[in-house]
UniProtKB/Swiss-Prot annotation:
Modified residues (Asymmetric dimethylarginine): 501
UniProt entry tagged with the keyword Transcription regulation: yes
Post-translational modification: The dimethylated protein is the major form.
EC numbers, comma separated: 2.1.1.319
A GO molecular function held by the record: histone H3R2 methyltransferase activity
One family name in Pfam for this protein: PrmA
Species, as recorded: Drosophila sechellia (Fruit fly)
Main location: cytoplasm
Lineage, top ranks: Eukaryota, Metazoa, Ecdysozoa, Arthropoda, Hexapoda
The name this protein goes by in its record: Histone-arginine methyltransferase CARMER
Length: 530
């Protein structure tokens, strides 16, 4: 699609007017401050006229003031939000309260004043209606979009070879779903998935990104000469308007334990733009849950909390905080990886259907548990990982974060019990995991476990927003007690076997190089020097 048809251009213009305007600039603006409110006396705040630069931000619109004579230096920066007080004054002036400043902006033309007024009104009009804003604290949203606005964080995700390559294979391997199709990329970030869609033959991709990463995505689009294919739209999917319905929605909405960050709700919300029988990549997600035994991990957290059990720390008694310290450490989910042999039973699978589940279904997720214990030991908590499937017309592709699969930047998550429970092979462990969404873009995770036929039970509530990142990069160790033969004898047997092979190779006229026989024949060089 080399250019937009008139009707499409009209719709895009409408979308721009509905969504918060971005990248607007107004030249020749005289900025005055109100010196005396009763007498309505004004004084010029800056010498000469200024240029106002407006750019979309997750919290509203950033307004930067620069001099008309020197635009390289920002004189002042303000934030226009839903709470900003503003009013029109005549045909070319606009009064606005920004931070502690009561300003009057006199524009160079009536058209500029009307456009600036629309910028302010759009912010005030849209934010109260936003589903995202209703479910998210402003401080959490600000930190979230700031985090994903860093190139280093985008690089961290892009360099996850398993993640990025699986997405590319799923999209290119199902090119029939993308060829000449309209695609929506939700939470586009750098736009890498949008580029994959274009590689698969997409006619048009709308890349929606709410963080400042949108400007970098636009740079990549322009430098790769695909601006006729990819339209980067700054904003949240809950707030923007598209000019048309789409055939496919692509996104990478998964967080730790699948649901963290509550991006899945945004992904499901985007279905309002999906045509009937449209595709979603990925199509569904499976959360796996299994009981595990890991005395080392439990002791590590327990001993950290025991710092607060000191009665003479530099002469200060800390013991009054021991209980709260213990509670805080055990409220932290552990993000790392492990040998799957620590799992004491087959995992329970909870499915999230991205094509049919509703946003509200993710506000309170109750997962019943029933485990048939395969090995006797102490259950220290529950382990979580997830798989997602891309169900395409040509092939199905899976992305897995299982401990048996190659490691990804999601790792796995473990939730500890403050009071572990001893359980025997053949017993049944039942219970429930309850994920309760909060306005910090995460979940409170409550675990309740009970050994059937006994009075033994244990529970805990954890804060998924505050995990402990334990992964060190060291190789995963097998759980204790899994060796069925002497490891020492196994090693020396291998050494003896390798030595016998090397000796045999030498006797047969060859030279062993790094354990590989017949590496080279040096006899010719020794007997026939040049």
């Amino acid at each position: 699609m080399s250019s937009l048809r008139p009707e499409e251009a009209r719709k895009l213009a409408t979308a721009a007017s509905v969504s918060p305007l971005s990248n607007c600039q107004f030249c020749g603006v005289v900025i005055s401050s109100i010196a005396d409110e009763q007498k309505l006396e004004f004084t010029n705040k800056y010498k000469g006229s200024c240029t106002l630069l407006c750019s979309y931000d997750s919290q509203g619109v950033v307004l930067r003031v620069v001099s008309d004579d020197d635009r390289s230096h920002v004189l002042k920066e303000y934030m226009i939000t839903a709470d900003t007080d503003a009013a029109q004054m005549g045909r070319r002036s606009y009064a606005v309260s920004l931070d502690a400043d009561n300003l009057v902006l006199r524009f160079g033309s009536e058209q500029d004043q009307q456009l600036f007024r629309k910028v302010v009104e759009n912010v005030k009009h849209l934010r109260p209606k936003s589903v995202f804003s209703q479910r998210t604290e402003e401080s959490s949203a600000s930190q979230y979009f700031q985090f994903y606005g860093y190139l280093s964080q985008q690089q961290n995700m892009m360099q996850d070879y398993v993640r990025t390559s699986t997405y590319q294979r799923a999209i290119l391997g199902n090119a029939v779903d993308f060829q000449d199709k309209i695609v929506l990329d939700v939470g586009a970030g750098s736009g890498i998935l949008s580029f994959f869609a274009v590689q698969a033959g997409a006619a048009k991709v709308y890349a929606i990104e709410a963080s400042n990463m949108a400007q970098y995505a636009q740079q990549l689009v322009e430098s790769n000469n695909v601006q006729h294919k990819i339209s980067v739209i700054p904003g949240k999917i809950e707030e923007i308007e598209l000019p048309e319905k789409v055939d496919v929605i692509i996104s990478e909405p998964m967080g730790y334990m699948l649901y963290n960050e509550r991006m899945l709700e945004t992904y499901l919300h985007a279905r309002k733009w999906l045509k009937p029988q449209g595709k979603m990549y990925p199509t569904h997600g499976d959360l796996h849950i299994a009981p595990f035994s890991d005395e080392s991990l439990y002791s590590e957290q327990y001993n950290k909390a025991n710092f607060w059990y000191q009665s003479a720390f530099h002469g200060v008694d800390l013991t009054t905080l021991h209980k709260e310290g213990m509670k805080e450490y055990f409220r932290q989910p552990i993000v790392d990886t492990f040998d799957i042999r620590i799992c004491m039973a087959k995992s329970v699978r909870h499915v999230c259907d991205f094509l049919n589940d509703k946003e509200d279904d993710l506000h309170l997720i109750s997962i019943p548990l029933e485990f048939h214990i395969l090995q006797t030991g102490i259950c220290h908590g529950l382990a979580f990982w997830f798989d997602v499937e891309f169900s395409g017309s040509s092939q199905n592709v899976w992305l897995s974060t299982s401990p048996t699969a190659p490691l990804t930047h999601w790792y796995q998550v473990r939730c500890l019990l403050p009071m572990p429970i001893f359980i025997k092979q053949g017993q049944t462990l039942t219970g429930r995991v309850l994920l309760e969404a909060n306005r910090r873009q995460s979940y409170d995770v409550t675990i309740d476990l009970h050994i059937e036929g006994t009075l033994i039970s244990s529970s805990n509530t954890l804060d998924l927003k505050n995990p402990y990142f334990r992964y060190t990069g060291a190789p995963v160790q097998a759980p204790p007690g899994t060796s069925t033969q002497s490891p020492s004898e196994q090693y020396w047997t291998q050494v003896d076997t390798q030595g016998s092979r090397n000796s045999s190779s030498m006797l047969n006229g060859g030279l062993s190089v790094n354990g590989i026989g017949d590496g080279m024949d040096i006899t010719h060089g020794l007997m026939h020097p040049h």
